[in-house]
Amino acid sequence: MKIKMRGQDVKVFYKDKEALHGITLDIPEHKVTALIGPSGCGKSTFLRCFNRMNDTIEGAKITGLITLDGENIYDSQIDVVELRARVGMVFQKPCPFPKSIFENVAYGPRIHGLVKSRAELHDIVEKSLRQAGLFEEVKDRLHEAGTSLSGGQQQRLCIARAIAVSPEVILMDEPCSALDPIATARIEELIDALRKDYTIVIVTHSMQQAARVSQYTAMFHLGHLVEVGATEMIFTSPKEQRTQDYITGRFG
């Protein structure tokens, strides 16, 4: 099993508050790794370390080592814009740009210089929308605003936007929390299909979702990594009592 990303002794501080306490976790390639735990446990903070989104928070400081294919992503020589293309992110609330459906997907490849012609750009947009399971629904309305889509469609548009710049890893921070059950099921099916081409890390509050979509699960509590393992093992025979208590609804 190849390790795509690795965090070693990762600590995150917000000014003088330590939010993560020395997290060490491997992210296997072409698998879905779910990060679970109660609100405020640090799972989203840890997720944002993987593409340096915490850099945008005033007073945030990260120590430890995080690597992508063995390369330290916090090295001073790293181009953060390029890193965020390689490690894409889908947020909790669908956030399409105030542009057309087509331009939402075309924007990334264009600014990253990934296309040489209009025809090539059209191909990337169509391929990305198809991978996100959205093309057939929007192919006759690509000129319409991305915000005109339903919530579930907007989230799939955001996934297409992330895919369009050919990432290696896709981070998802509770991507279904604002969606209805039908839209959630579509996203979950999509996640399972996408792992053939991408490595996925998902933060979720839904135990059922973590069990359905992931191959590996990591349990967080109060800024600590409680345990990590194959999802089936975590949900059927966890080693730690805190994991058992959380999964069975005794706290959270």
From Swiss-Prot:
Residue intervals of the ABC transporter domain: 5-247
Residues engaged in binding ATP: G37, P38, S39, G40, C41, G42, K43, S44
Compartments in which it is found: Cell inner membrane
EC identifiers of the protein: 7.3.2.1
Lipid bilayer topology: Peripheral membrane protein
Translocase in keyword set: yes
PROSITE patterns, A to Z: ABC_TRANSPORTER_1 (PS00211), ABC_TRANSPORTER_2 (PS50893), PSTB (PS51238)
Pfam families named among the record's database cross-references: ABC_tran
MF terms (GO), sorted A to Z: ATP binding; ATP hydrolysis activity; ATPase-coupled phosphate ion transmembrane transporter activity
Family assignment from sequence similarity: Belongs to the ABC transporter superfamily. Phosphate importer (TC 3.A.1.7) family.
Role noted for this protein: Part of the ABC transporter complex PstSACB involved in phosphate import. Responsible for energy coupling to the transport system.
Xref: NCBIfam families: 3a0107s01c2
The protein, known as: Phosphate import ATP-binding protein PstB
Taxonomic source organism: Bartonella quintana (strain Toulouse)
